[in-house]
């Protein structure tokens, strides 16, 4: 709201403002005129008053999206992951306990600094645990570091894709296979043909838009970079997939494809834990939502029956 007030103040002073965003609600709220681009090309320029959100989406994607979220048809099974009294040594994470089931998409909501990201990083062994217990399929796992966590069946798609997700100087094949190189070892050598074949399979199955697998990942769009990172983790065959802001900075068409990938993983019996700042996204994709506040778990709600107001109230509980 403060940003919007500043933008409106600058506009009233005669400043011209170019505002770039994937969030259509913001665009329609503050813009006088909207320009839509797709694949580096100009598509349309119209007065904001003449546009609806659905019309913007259609122009952005090049086709009509009847639903913003895929229909949930995943089957939820028994408890797979049990987290008890988890606290961080150097983070604000404080006595967090929850359960996640096979085939479940578990959302994590909260304000910035609430402990959402810290929770995923703690489970994955990036940060030091002060106390608590993590049990996977009835067996305690220590997850003292990412290497150990990967061996135990965990994968983490990080919040800052460009800083901690991709290897920008490497190509798509190298980014896809880098966490699973042992699969391609033949003595001291790597089986390049097998690596190429695997990468081609994922490019096709995840519909990665790229000239070829030799393309540097840094030249891809955000959505396609995210698909490559997902392919990397799928190669490790994780049981629990931790996703931190998986659709941040991604256009609405690519978002739908990411949502479908998440749902497909849940349908295969994987447990998906997903942090998002977009409450509509959590409500549309997840089965259940944990709400973090001040490093503590302030509530757990059913995505079918809750609403944004209830989530925001819980998010402010320990602020």
PLM feature spans:
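Glycine-rich phosphate-binding loops of nucleotide-dependent enzymes
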Residues: 1-319
């Amino acid at each position: 709201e403060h940003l919007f007030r500043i933008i409106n103040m600058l506009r009233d002073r005669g400043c011209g403002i170019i505002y770039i965003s994937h969030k259509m609600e913001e665009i329609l709220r503050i813009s006088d005129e909207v320009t839509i681009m797709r694949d580096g090309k100009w598509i349309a320029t119209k007065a904001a008053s003449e546009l609806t959100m659905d019309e913007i989406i259609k122009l952005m994607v090049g086709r009509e999206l009847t639903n913003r979220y895929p229909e949930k048809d995943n089957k939820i099974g028994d408890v797979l992951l049990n987290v008890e009294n988890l606290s961080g040594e150097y983070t604000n994470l404080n006595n967090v306990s929850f359960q996640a089931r096979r085939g479940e998409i578990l959302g994590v909501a909260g304000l910035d600094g609430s402990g959402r990201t810290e929770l995923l990083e703690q489970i994955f062994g990036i940060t030091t645990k002060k106390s608590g217990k993590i049990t996977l399929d009835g067996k305690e796992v220590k997850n003292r570091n990412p290497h150990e966590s990967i061996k135990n069946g965990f994968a983490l798609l990080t919040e800052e894709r460009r800083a901690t997700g991709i290897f920008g100087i490497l190509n798509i094949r190298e980014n896809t296979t880098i966490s699973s190189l042992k699969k391609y070892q033949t003595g001291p050598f790597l089986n390049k043909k097998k690596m190429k074949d695997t990468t081609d399979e994922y490019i096709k199955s995840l519909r990665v838009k790229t000239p070829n697998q030799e393309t540097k990942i840094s030249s891809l769009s955000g959505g396609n970079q995210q698909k490559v990172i997902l392919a990397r983790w799928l190669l490790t065959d994780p049981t629990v997939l931790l996703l931190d802001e998986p659709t941040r900075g991604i256009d609405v068409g690519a978002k739908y494809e990411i949502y479908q990938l998440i749902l497909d993983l849940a349908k295969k019996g994987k447990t998906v834990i997903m942090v998002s700042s977009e409450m509509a996204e959590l409500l549309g994709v997840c089965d259940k939502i944990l709400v973090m506040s001040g490093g503590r778990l302030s509530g757990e709600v059913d995505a079918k029956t809750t609403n944004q107001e209830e989530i925001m109230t819980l998010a402010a509980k320990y602020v």
